[in-house]
């Protein structure tokens, strides 16, 4: 399946909630307000449509509250999808649902070897032709190397060292082939050096805005959709020729996610 325009897979938050605790943001004692979450999801949906993205929808499933975080479903490469093998049992039920959706949409799905944990585009992001791969907290480095070998592309492994930034897409966001947003303390010293060596223009995010999930953004051309409360990043993006579009996503931060 090949799309002619930027296409984003989303899942309505019908069954979203904090049903378990698998990252430091999640607390069953601090539940998400489902009504507000739906309003925030609908605002993001409308914003992405306004930015000329094509939206594909996945049907929500009761008992799979994190299905809303569709970037974790797998890594798309042309007509193929490398399906996630989630580290936590609480999320492993998502994979058959994801697989069914992708196959019905015309993709070839590829399952991970059983011994490799891999969490999709949550931990694997392209900047240019290079695959940047976050590992240790959720995905295994061997899994990321296996995926890169299957795709025959260069991979740069990046060790994540802060449990609050457990996926690569919570602390790193490519903007173009030569630019990216990142939160330096989320990486070990080698990872920081590797990013600096391979990406000419890096935009660091300050602590307060990293905690607002500034890096967990959606980039469509020169437009960047992100959570509210990131004024420094928004200013820097404008200076670099991008147009930031903020929309509140606080209810999803309660589960460790954003846009």
Kindly give the residue locations of the regions a language model identified.
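The feature marks the mature, well-folded catalytic cores of soluble enzymes
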Residues: 1-259
């Amino acid at each position: 399946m090949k799309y002619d325009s930027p296409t984003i897979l989303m899942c309505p938050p019908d069954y979203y909630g904090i049903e378990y605790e698998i990252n430091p943001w999640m607390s069953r004692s601090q539940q998400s307000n489902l009504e507000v979450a739906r309003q925030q999801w609908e605002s993001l949906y409308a914003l992405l449509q306004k930015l000329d993205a094509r939206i594909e929808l996945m049907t929500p499933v009761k008992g799979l509250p994190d299905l809303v975080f569709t970037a974790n479903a797998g890594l798309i490469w042309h007509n193929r999808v490398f399906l996630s093998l989630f580290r936590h049992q609480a999320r492993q039920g998502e994979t058959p649902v994801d697989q069914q959706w992708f196959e019905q949409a015309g993709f070839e799905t590829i399952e991970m070897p059983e011994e490799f944990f891999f969490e999709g585009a949550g931990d694997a992001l392209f900047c240019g032709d290079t695959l940047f791969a976050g590992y240790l907290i959720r995905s295994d480095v061997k899994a990321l190397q296996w995926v890169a070998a299957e795709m025959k592309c260069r991979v740069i492994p990046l060790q994540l060292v802060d449990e609050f930034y457990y996926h690569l897409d919570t602390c790193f966001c490519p903007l173009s082939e030569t630019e990216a947003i990142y939160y330096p303390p989320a990486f070990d010293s080698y990872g920081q050096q590797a990013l600096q060596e391979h990406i000419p223009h890096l935009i660091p995010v300050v602590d307060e805005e990293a905690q607002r999930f500034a890096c967990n953004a959606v980039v469509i051309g020169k437009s960047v959709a992100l959570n509210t409360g990131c004024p420094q990043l928004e200013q820097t993006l404008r200076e670099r020729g991008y147009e930031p579009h903020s929309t509140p996503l606080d209810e999803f931060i309660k589960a460790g996610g954003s846009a």
